[in-house]
Amino acid sequence: MERISTNQLYNSGIPVTVPSPLPAIPATLDENIPRIPDGQNVPRERELRSTPMPPHQNQSTVAPLHGHFQSSTGSVGPLRSSQAIRFSSVSSNEQYTNANPYNSQPPSSGSSSTLNYGSQYGGFEPSLTDFPRDAGPTWCPDPVDGLLGYTDDVPAGNNLTENSSIAAGDELAKQSEWWNDFMNYDWKDIDNTACTETQPQVGPAAQSSVAVHQSAAQQSVSSQSGEPSAVAIPSPSGASNTSNSKTRMRWTPELHERFVDAVNLLGGSEKATPKGVLKLMKADNLTIYHVKSHLQKYRTARYRPELSEGSSEKKAASKEDIPSIDLKGGNFDLTEALRLQLELQKRLHEQLEIQRSLQLRIEEQGKCLQMMLEQQCIPGTDKAVDASTSAEGTKPSSDLPESSAVKDVPENSQNGIAKQTESGDR
């Protein structure tokens, strides 16, 4: 069986229905619906093109509609649209596609199709019973006449997406402009506060740079004149005029020699005062604070208390043993250093030999003591042996009478026995 095309259905005037789970509208309603001439559709299509879709509506939120389709042939048929309205286009397969749910193609090239919703244009107004229970008030009360009117040129789905994307782009552009204005306003305030904070710091920095240049110029002048001068090093926190008097200073060897001479002229470090030393030195960029601190260091370095007398004696002996080396004069050579190292090694070996000889003597003395103790113990043992021998010699002399008595007893007994035997024989 051959399939009937949609063009034949539209030309024959048979009502066309799209499959939908919603109940169908009875055919008797076709008689009550007035027909709209084609002339009225043209200005309405222009209005639909000019009116964009509201941005808050989306394809998925369109509620089910019921309307009528008006064609150029004059036939009017009921048309349903579910949550995803699908119209078939004229193609080889003539099947329903899911790519563009709002895409509808006209039955012929010369005819135009519109979907009119609302009683004011002569269309069919749906009743409350036609809506499904699941569908709620998903749209706003604004008129939606311009939502489903399409032309031949551009598909309806693309038009909707373009209008929605344009509206969303406009909203994003407005939000970005508002955000940029807000950020620019805040950054301007921050920049103004930063400028006001940094402006007061320009003066002290310039003053410190001027002070550094002045000190460098004075140093160059003093070096040309041949007089020693103190090199002042500004501290990192010295940005005010009050800190110029307490700037750090590097004491050169020449300046230290002049300081020592001034202290000696004043009678020593204990009697010298910072003011008197400053007057005698007559150095540039030198304040009383510098002289005072240097004088305290000089006193502590010169009069350092010794820990004990033994340590002082050891230090004196070491100074006498080791020859002095002039490191400042530059006479220190490698050969001299090697010679000193050899001398130290020799002294160490000598000390080790002395310790060994002492140990040997101690061992010999110990052996002598042991021999003496042994000799003292031997005479005592001889006396004990003599006493024991003498005691043993006395004991046999005392035992002699007993033995003689014993001997006498057997002899008497024998004599008696012999006498008895003689008397018995008789």
UniProtKB/Swiss-Prot annotation:
Pfam families: Myb_CC_LHEQLE, Myb_DNA-binding. Its main location: nucleus. Expressed in roots, stems, leaves and fruits. Expressed in the root cap and in the exodermis, sclerenchyma and vascular tissues of the root, in the cortex cells and the stele of lateral roots, in the mesophyll cells of the leaf, in pollen, vascular cylinder of the anther and the veins of the lemma, palea and pistils, and in all node I tissues. GO terms for biological process: cellular response to phosphate starvation; regulation of phosphate transport; response to nitrate. Residues 69-81, 237-246, 387-401, 411-426 have a biased composition (Polar residues). Residues 102-119, 205-225 have a biased composition (Low complexity). Residues 27-81, 96-123, 198-247, 302-326, 382-426 are annotated as: Disordered. Residues 274-299 bind DNA. GO terms for cellular component: cytoplasm; nucleus. Residues 303-322 have a biased composition (Basic and acidic residues). Disruption phenotype: Repressed nitrate induction of phosphate (Pi) uptake activity. Reduced biomass under Pi starvation; this phenotype is aggravated by the loss of both RLI1 and PHR2 and is associated with leaf senescence symptoms and lower Pi concentration. Interacts (via C-terminus) with SPX4 (via N-terminus) in the presence of inositol polyphosphate. Interacts (via C-terminus) with SPX1 and SPX2 (via SPX domain). Interacts with RLI1 isoform RLI1b in the nucleus. This is Protein PHOSPHATE STARVATION RESPONSE 2. It comes from Oryza sativa subsp. japonica.
